[in-house]
């Protein structure tokens, strides 16, 4: 199928279709399990001339399996370019380090994944890169935080773990007026639910370990971009100047697993979105539950924004019980659902953000992020929604 025709397909078809392998005509992609590739005179000359992406050199620089994953990510994100990385945090680190230098400033949402927050709030200050944390759901707060040296505005499409949804269009306008690059972490939504590049975002980062892979068996990340504001070869510059130097390429077998995951992304997310909505409605009416955060609920503060930006509301939700001890008792007594880290897979997983993912974030900062000690995060899987509801009911009955 020609690229122009494939571009007109609906999302489900784009995700499921992979062109056959040129050499074998296999409809499934091969795995190139090699760290080294043989040169000849022509390949040597291409390398000398700087045409490094068109040839295979060394596994840390790239691999044909990795390139196949990058091409498929471009298709489902609506991107002009993609760079695969070893993890979602590698995607975030590589994209930021590729854009920033000493003396630069970042405006970041105050509710972001804990490792992102810690990296910007602590590690980057060692290199004279400052960050101001604000509520990106409030465009005025973002605008007020800008400085002459602000190079990046960073936010999550659906915030981890509070499920906050920022309006993208005002952030795009602010970034363009200021000359800053707008980066969106789209992990909680996935490209099935939201494609931020279509809304004008400059760079999208994904933890492909989550919904994209979808089976809790592979770690990987992706940086996707449009070329209307950034140079066409921007990600290739980052590949060679940053990613290769940090040593964070995507492994070939993980690339193959993630390619397989993309093919079922649409059908998995359809079920996960439906189950999350059913579970959110049920928990909102439960007497032991203080509050539920899910963009599909009318009670969600940004419900109207979510309706505008997303055809469905994702497979993630959060709810709150009275105390951390109560939260632990609920999760420790779940039978069908897993009490485990990570998200976006075929099994429903749960965690207590305050004492797990955000454990290293000081309590005062967690309160500013609206992360309560009794907050429970749920990533819905492919189980029947009625069975999920029954499992939470029996666990909640014990507190």
Task: Outline where the language-model segments fall.
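PLP-dependent enzyme catalytic core of the Aspartate aminotransferase-like
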Residues: 1, 121-122, 130, 144, ...
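N-terminal glycine-rich, Lys/His-bearing helix-loop that initiates the first secondary-structure elements
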Residues: 1-53
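Conserved PLP-enzyme active-site core in the AAT-like
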Residues: 2-6, 12-20, 82-288, 293, ...
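Glycine-rich beta-alpha junction loops
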Residues: 20, 33-39, 188, 210, ...
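Conserved N-terminal alpha-helix of the aminotransferase class I/II PLP-enzyme fold
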Residues: 39-90, 115-122
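Short amphipathic alpha-helical segments
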Residues: 54, 80, 219, 254, ...
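Acidic-histidine catalytic/liganding microenvironments
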Residues: 76, 283-287, 334
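Conserved C-terminal alpha-helix-loop-beta "cap" of PLP-dependent enzymes
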Residues: 289-376, 380
